[in-house]
């Protein structure tokens, strides 16, 4: 069958570099700058930089379960810094699981933050916290990551948080510990270079929120419907799904849709 032959992997060719450039552009355009006090971003080219967070080395670049694909390329943020000749300290700070905090990793991260002009903290939701086949029970960030952020901010006030998450997390409970907050979502295979471009000022972040970020999970009307019964959930808010509820009832939010 000629059609099947034409569609086979063996006979299919594409430009890997051009493919990666499209992924890079999509990543750059999707990031949302939530906070930038004291113009901490972009990072100056001669700044002493410390990078904290396992996501910087092991990026969560896509969703889990049946959405998983094998990328043609994969460059972490740390790799992107190396390619650009940026000399930065790195400390993982935590493990990408739901296990309790590792005091040794926390202490290493706090020590690495000392004396830095800017600390880039890569925080977010590991795949164990959000993926296919189960529901999240909270909008909060993992407690061990928040504790680490507080410890680092107590040592160095020039903290920028880079979020890696597939869905909304509450920001208000910990925002005071960061001068800058960049929502980067799950950035795909070219997320590392895209983050380097945005954080160091080659590209200005211009993404807009496709979701509302509430102050608290209980501010969302859908909360009372969860978890439903026998696998079924009644959307009791009716037409007032998402931002429509907040707009209609003038409910204050942390960051609005759009």
What are these regions (language model features)?
Residues 7-17, 21-258:
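C-terminal non-catalytic regions of proteins with extracellular/luminal or membrane-system context
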């Amino acid at each position: 069958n000629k059609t099947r032959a034409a569609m086979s992997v063996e006979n299919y060719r594409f430009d890997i570099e051009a493919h990666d450039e499209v992924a890079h552009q999509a990543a750059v355009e999707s990031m949302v700058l939530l906070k930038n006090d004291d113009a901490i971003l972009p990072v100056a080219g001669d700044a002493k930089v410390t990078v904290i967070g396992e996501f910087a080395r092991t990026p969560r670049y896509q969703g889990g379960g049946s959405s998983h694909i094998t990328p043609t390329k994969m460059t972490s943020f740390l790799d992107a810094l190396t390619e650009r000749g940026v000399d930065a300290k790195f400390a993982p700070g935590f493990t990408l699981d739901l296990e309790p905090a590792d005091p040794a990793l926390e202490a290493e991260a706090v020590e690495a933050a000392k004396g830095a002009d800017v600390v880039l903290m890569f925080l977010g939701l590991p795949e164990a916290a959000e993926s296919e086949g189960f529901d999240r029970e909270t909008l909060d960030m993992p407690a061990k990551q928040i504790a680490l952020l507080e410890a680092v901010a107590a040592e160095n006030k020039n903290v920028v948080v880079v979020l890696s998450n597939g869905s909304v997390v509450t920001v208000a409970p910990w925002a005071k510990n960061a001068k800058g907050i960049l929502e980067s979502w799950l950035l795909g295979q070219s997320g590392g270079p895209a983050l380097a471009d945005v954080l160091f000022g080659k590209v200005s972040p211009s993404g807009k929120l496709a979701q509302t970020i509430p102050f608290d999970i209980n501010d969302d009307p859908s909360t009372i419907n969860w978890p439903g019964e026998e696998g079924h959930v009644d959307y009791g808010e009716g037409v007032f799904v998402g931002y429509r509820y907040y707009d209609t009832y003038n409910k204050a939010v942390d960051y609005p849709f759009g």
